[in-house]
Amino acid sequence: MAKEECKALLDALNKATACYHHLVLTIGGSADSQNLREELQKTRQKAQELAVAIRLRLTAPLRDRSLGAEERAEFERLWVAFSGCLDLLEADMRRALALSTEFPLQEPRRPLVRTGVEGGATGVAARALSVRSLRHEAHRDFDVEDLHQLEREILQVGEMIQDMEMKVNVPRWTVQARQAAGAELLSSASAGVSSVGGVSVEQRTGPCDLSKAKAATIFSAVLLAAVALAVCVAKLS
């Protein structure tokens, strides 16, 4: 039960981290706004809440020496995936701090990237936070105060990573994956190909392909005849 709960929380953390990464890339662009900065704050705070919950649920089993080898291996895989999410979150938070400092909202500015996209990314953030919609209630000086808060949260995430490494020693290179990298993407792609495979095979072996083959043969014969005729004319001249 604890393992399934950890998997569900880790899946939610993956979504929140991916959403935060997507939102960070729009800072300084034509879609940047105070609403975007508020969505960034809510998304990263949601990710941190999930991270705290996952850490508590993973630390206890991994420190339990009576845990079976198979169960321990599964929890170690979850731990490595969790550590990777935290590293990405910390890197994106540092990137958000740098971009937000470079492009403050209260000063006249030119968009960093004119993507042609207008409006915020409320829908993306709402899906990651598992809510229907986001309410924007930030005041005018929100971005200035948020920068200081973001600095503190970056330190907190860094301390969390260090604390995890001290309490649970799971070197990433010792954890073996159950499947090859990108296996999920390959399996979904192969499933899509197999669903249309029957149609494509029938199309290749149908009468339409035979007529195309005949036309190609006739065209090749005409081309060879034209080349031979040109050679003969050249010799006679």
From Swiss-Prot:
<keyword id="KW-0472">Membrane</keyword>
<dbReference type="GO" id="GO:0007186">
    <property type="term" value="P:G protein-coupled receptor signaling pathway"/>
</dbReference>
<feature type="region of interest" description="SNARE-like">
    <location>
        <begin position="153"/>
        <end position="202"/>
    </location>
</feature>
<dbReference type="GO" id="GO:0097381">
    <property type="term" value="C:photoreceptor disc membrane"/>
</dbReference>
<keyword id="KW-0716">Sensory transduction</keyword>
<dbReference type="GO" id="GO:0050908">
    <property type="term" value="P:detection of light stimulus involved in visual perception"/>
</dbReference>
<comment type="similarity">
    <text>Belongs to the RGS7BP/RGS9BP family.</text>
</comment>
<protein>
    <recommendedName>
        <fullName>Regulator of G-protein signaling 9-binding protein</fullName>
    </recommendedName>
</protein>
<feature type="coiled-coil region">
    <location>
        <begin position="29"/>
        <end position="58"/>
    </location>
</feature>
<dbReference type="InterPro" id="IPR026512">
    <property type="entry name" value="RGS7BP/RGS9BP"/>
</dbReference>
<keyword id="KW-0734">Signal transduction inhibitor</keyword>
<comment type="function">
    <text>Regulator of G protein-coupled receptor (GPCR) signaling in phototransduction. Participates in the recovery phase of visual transduction via its interaction with RGS9-1 isoform. Acts as a membrane-anchor that mediates the targeting of RGS9-1 to the photoreceptor outer segment, where phototransduction takes place. Enhances the ability of RGS9-1 to stimulate G protein GTPase activity, allowing the visual signal to be terminated on the physiologically time scale. It also controls the proteolytic stability of RGS9-1, probably by protecting it from degradation.</text>
</comment>
<comment type="subunit">
    <text>Specifically interacts with isoform RGS9-1 of RGS9. Component of the RGS9-1-Gbeta5 complex composed of RGS9-1, Gbeta5 (GNB5) and RGS9BP.</text>
</comment>
<feature type="topological domain" description="Extracellular">
    <location>
        <begin position="235"/>
        <end position="237"/>
    </location>
</feature>
<dbReference type="GO" id="GO:0120200">
    <property type="term" value="C:rod photoreceptor outer segment"/>
</dbReference>
<feature type="topological domain" description="Cytoplasmic">
    <location>
        <begin position="1"/>
        <end position="214"/>
    </location>
</feature>
<dbReference type="GO" id="GO:0009968">
    <property type="term" value="P:negative regulation of signal transduction"/>
</dbReference>
<feature type="coiled-coil region">
    <location>
        <begin position="144"/>
        <end position="169"/>
    </location>
</feature>
<keyword id="KW-1133">Transmembrane helix</keyword>
<keyword id="KW-0812">Transmembrane</keyword>
<dbReference type="GO" id="GO:0043005">
    <property type="term" value="C:neuron projection"/>
</dbReference>
<keyword id="KW-0844">Vision</keyword>
<keyword id="KW-0175">Coiled coil</keyword>
<feature type="transmembrane region" description="Helical; Anchor for type IV membrane protein">
    <location>
        <begin position="215"/>
        <end position="234"/>
    </location>
</feature>
